């Protein structure tokens, strides 16, 4: 039978509940337990797919095509377990399900209410499909006190009563701020947050307290007394250098031991922390460093590129080097020469994005990388812009553009109207909905055996995750290849270009998919490992 850990947050948002959940899952895995993590998001969007990156950050895509919260990326990277559609739910999806049931008459004429109908829907989501797991960790998005989170908190309160005794534990993550004028950490925000949580009917078993300095024993005792939590269950969560130090830090503070104790599991299997210690050692003891320019359009919010950032660091882990990131807003190149920005970097990465803003800057970045022989990695939109650059400057198609930007005589990149998903034909219309209408999830690609990318993968058959509505136009393939841009990877039916590369360039690869979504600290994605390796070679030339 699965045991349930419910993780809530208080005082302020962005305390790191997702990292805390992922780290705890990793610690339980290290003891040999099977763990699943689920995220419950209180916003009314059905999913984050149509939300601005500045509002939400990255949209993490799963193998089965779910557009989910970026925390699911942390879950995958820390546990290695691929997430799916059933690991993330939003208030919007819950209400949509309920309204569909009401329209069908499933409620037999009853008045549909938050309690019991909404809370029952949440509970069903939490409980379903957990037969193969020892622990299910549920992170509740938002902060205690938010009106949006109330149905979720009520649902997990009910579960605490309905689950067998000893199979549900509540962890509350809070902040203990340091007040310079007083010269001390303050417990009052945590006390009030716990008071709010208890007023809902949830008594936390464990307090995980964020702080920027050591919490004195006297303050821990104070929190224990006023929050009605055992002193051993008041666990400090101090700031660390990297997120991959968190599992080791939490283990030293006894978080996993306290969770197991709360479940009455004693003695518990000893954890094997060797792989986390190896990752931490490599991060803190690099043998060199490289600088990668990321030419993007959402650089004002780094969370928009969360998986990309982590995948680049994984590439550094694979090569035992530190990866420094130089963030460049693509629009800058539309009014300034790219050379001063890019001459000293060891690699250029152009990530995914949507819309015309910054496109010309990304095209110029691809041109600089091609002409100067600087390693170039184009992902999704970055591959499309590399193809437009080649069409303009190598093939001579001056008007080469993307139909995403408006009507064009030379749509080197165009809207996909249909594609195969398994044996089913998916179709889309230009005037259709935005939400859930892209090519989403894992798709197969076939690589040319003699291509550079096939050598990197060590295979000619790959499965990678996609999130795009536009695609390089196959009608331009022959002319682009004649100019030197090799279409090294295609969809199995030969219709959709998946990867491009230059044979006469040290490392210039564009991919239509998002390899960053499948990279792990213990298993760096081969493309990122190879890209950083090429950057190391470039660093010897600069």
Curated annotation (Swiss-Prot):
CTP binds at residues 13, 146-148, 186-191, 222. Residues 1-265 are annotated as: Amidoligase domain. GO terms for molecular function: ATP binding; CTP synthase activity; glutaminase activity; identical protein binding; metal ion binding. UTP binds at residues 13, 186-191, 222. The keyword Cell membrane does not apply. Keywords: ATP-binding, Glutamine amidotransferase, Ligase, Magnesium, Metal-binding, Nucleotide-binding, Pyrimidine biosynthesis. ATP binds at residues 14-19, 71. One of its GO terms (cellular component) is cytosol. It is an enzyme of class 6 (ligase). PROSITE patterns: GATASE_TYPE_1. CDD domains: CTPS_N, GATase1_CTP_Synthase. One of its GO terms (biological process) is pyrimidine nucleobase biosynthetic process. L-glutamine binds at residues 54, 353, 381-384, 404, 469. Residues 291-541 form the Glutamine amidotransferase type-1 domain. Mg(2+) binds at residues 71, 139. The active site is at residues 380, 514, 516. Homotetramer. Belongs to the CTP synthase family. Catalyzes the ATP-dependent amination of UTP to CTP with either L-glutamine or ammonia as the source of nitrogen. Regulates intracellular CTP levels through interactions with the four ribonucleotide triphosphates. CTPSs have evolved a hybrid strategy for distinguishing between UTP and CTP. The overlapping regions of the product feedback inhibitory and substrate sites recognize a common feature in both compounds, the triphosphate moiety. To differentiate isosteric substrate and product pyrimidine rings, an additional pocket far from the expected kinase/ligase catalytic site, specifically recognizes the cytosine and ribose portions of the product inhibitor. This is CTP synthase. It comes from Brucella suis (strain ATCC 23445 / NCTC 10510). The lineage of its organism: Bacteria, Pseudomonadati, Pseudomonadota, Alphaproteobacteria, Hyphomicrobiales.
